[in-house]
Structure formats: C-alpha cells, structure tokens
C-alpha cells in the first residue's frame, strides 16, 4: 500500500475498492507522503468519528500530525465557521440535528462563495468513506485544494455506503 501511495502521481485520484482492500491504509500513506513535501496543510476528511480517530492516530505515529488535519466533514465545517468568525447554526434555529448539520454545510459554501472563507487552503485533501459524502461536500472539499497541486484523493466503496438514498457523485466531475 505504501508503494502504491507513493506512485499515484500528480493530480486528482479516485480509488474504488471493496471492504478490507486497503483503501484507508493507502490514503494514510498518501497523506504522509504529501505532507512531507507540502507547504500548506494536508486535509483528511471522513464521515465517521471512528475512522477519523484511527487516521489521526496514524498521522501521529508517522510524525506528521502537525501537517495533517484529520476531521469528519461536519467537524471541519464547524471549524471553518469558527475560524473565520461566522456564526454556526444553533440548536435553537435548527432543533433537528441533521438539519443543523446541513445548515452548517450551506453556511460554509455561502462563506466560500462570498470570499469570507478562503479557497485553496490545503496542498491536498484526501477523503475517506467518500461513498457517504454528498456531491456538494466533495465539490466543497475540491475548492479547498491548492490549484497548483491539484491533489484531491477520494476513496470509496459503493457497497459500504451508509446512506443508500443519497445522491451519488459523478466521479468524473
């Protein structure tokens, strides 16, 4: 997996594999490889807290935790809002948790569109569990990648998708 991660070349990459095929391990090795050469942070986004925690541990074990940010997508959205002084949707406004999460994503997209949150903050963005991401989330993550590096990596397995009813991304976009 480490050799594959180093030999992926430049630009955007989409990796599809079945459960247990080593997708997350390849992603971790790739993040380390990119982080060692990066001038800006590397971002890893996941859907679930458990995988985010394991990837965060992996980055610490590899000594690149100061160059790699590992977050769930929604935690990253809240961090962006907090970092740039934009009020996050509150439980009072959105008592339903899922609606509050969706509103946080909308606020980040709006803030990026309006220039309140800068694009291209990361030399690379790597997305694990992309089968559980909505197309809008992937598009937002892609906007955060430095256009010079074009280093967006997405790993997925449609069979593992938690939310089967979600709109599926068109990977060529």
Set out the residue ranges of the language-model regions.
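Conserved helicase motor core of SF1/SF2 NTP-dependent helicases
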Residues: 3-6, 12-84, 124-173
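Conserved RecA-like ASCE ATPase "motif II neighborhood" in helicase/translocase motors
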Residues: 84-121, 129, 133-143
